[in-house]
Amino acid sequence: MPTTPSAQGSGNQNTATSQQIVNNFRELIKDPKSLDEAVNYMYQTLLDDAVAGIFIETHHLRKTGNLSALDGVAEDSTYRICEMPNLDIFGISTAKKPMDCTCPNCDRLVAAARFAPHLEKCMGMGRISSRIASRRLATKEGSSAALLHSGGNAGGTDDEDDVDWSSDKRKKKSSQSSRNNGSKKNNGKTF
């Protein structure tokens, strides 16, 4: 019986390179009588290589403290269905919760649906507030121009700066008749 690499020690097989394995396999295939021996040799070599790789990897993971990572993350227990009143199947309350927000400006509780309009009015940032602010700026510019021309106090008071103070000096709206030359029809145009 000829001596084959499988009959030699398994230590030599582990150190054999892939080129040596291929060369040995080709020599064994040349003789049809030793074909069974060649298949056993190839199987044993591949099995030894795979087992040695697993051993080396497991040893490395144990030494580095990462062996628990090989097991993976433990799965939670199976999902439980909750069958209590006012709870959905996951155990979360289905009751409508009153959504109230606290205004950062006045510390009032305001319904969530009304929070944005409330905050807009509370901080003076709304459409009407911007009109009042632009009107206030226009009156300040007019009064400062009067102060420069007169050289003294124009008689203004602090009340003019207040948002809720109404001045008698406001311009009255022009009447419809003066705009249309007395005619409502055809916007005062004659044909």
Curated annotation (Swiss-Prot):
Q: For this entry, list what GO says about its biological process.
A: chromatin organization; mRNA export from nucleus; positive regulation of DNA-templated transcription; protein transport; regulation of transcription by RNA polymerase II
One Gene Ontology molecular-function label: transcription coactivator activity
Which key words are in the record? Activator, Chromatin regulator, Cytoplasm, Metal-binding, mRNA transport, Nucleus, Phosphoprotein, Protein transport, Transcription, Transcription regulation, Translocation, Transport, Zinc, Zinc-finger
Region Disordered, annotated ranges: 146-191
Instruction: Please give the residue positions where the record annotates the modification Phosphoserine.
Output: 167
- Quaternary structure, from the entry: Component of some SAGA transcription coactivator-HAT complexes, at least composed of Ada2b, not/nonstop, Pcaf/Gcn5, Sgf11 and Spt3. Within the SAGA complex, Sgf11, e(y)2, and not/nonstop form an additional subcomplex of SAGA called the DUB module (deubiquitination module). Interacts directly with not/nonstop. Interacts with the AMEX complex component xmas-2. Interacts with Cbp80; important for promoter recruitment of Sgf11 that is not associated with the DUB module.
Per its record, how is this protein called by name? SAGA-associated factor 11 homolog
Q: Which lineage is the organism of this entry classified under, starting from the top rank?
A: Eukaryota, Metazoa, Ecdysozoa, Arthropoda, Hexapoda
